[in-house]
UniProtKB/Swiss-Prot annotation:
Gene3D superfamilies xrefs: 1.10.1760.20
Protein's UniProt keywords contain Transmembrane helix: yes
Transmembrane segments: 8-28, 41-61, 72-92, 110-130, 146-166
Compartment(s) where it occurs, according to its Swiss-Prot or TrEMBL record: Cell membrane
Similarity-based family: Belongs to the UPF0397 family.
Organism: Vibrio vulnificus (strain YJ016)
Keywords: Cell membrane, Membrane, Transmembrane, Transmembrane helix
Protein name: UPF0397 protein VVA0348
UniProt key word Phosphoprotein: no
Lineage: Bacteria, Pseudomonadati, Pseudomonadota, Gammaproteobacteria, Vibrionales
One term under GO cellular component: plasma membrane
Membrane topology: Multi-pass membrane protein
Amino acid sequence: MNLSAKTVVVIAIGAALYGIGGLPMFGIPVFANTTLKPAMAVLALFSVLFGPLVGFLVGFIGHWVTDLFAGWGVWLTWVLGSGIVGLIIGLFPSLTRNRLEKGEFNLKDFSLFVVLALLGNVFGYGCSAFLDTILYAEPFTKVFTQLTIIASGNTVLIAIVGYFILKSVAKRNKQSRNLTEA
């Protein structure tokens, strides 16, 4: 895998923003060891703008950073879950034929964005919950409750914040003021 310097910088910035933004002081505690993080919008934005590889790495590295600084130890199962969320949401550009880059973001695109956010959260954190049950002998009811709360809460948060951000990105791209070579 050969990543360009730009891609590495984007991953570093995204992971830092997602990681620091995911700290408990910026989140809303909702259940045992479960916090709704507004930083999920950062993960979604980087995934949509830069694709599945960047999305995965921003989620994976960023969640690792959160766990390190929060002081509760690194839960690799949930780190992997965040990576999977970023990867799935990162499919958006290819599924929409890069319409966002052309300044287009319609209701169909928004619906796809929300579906990808839901699938990413259910599948990504579903893997985390399953692995917690298998590897750490966590009670199934606890991890299932965490999964349900996180998947629904994150999807709503990503949909609301993401709508306004992606509308703004589309508007900016439509005005052709983005930084591209002539």
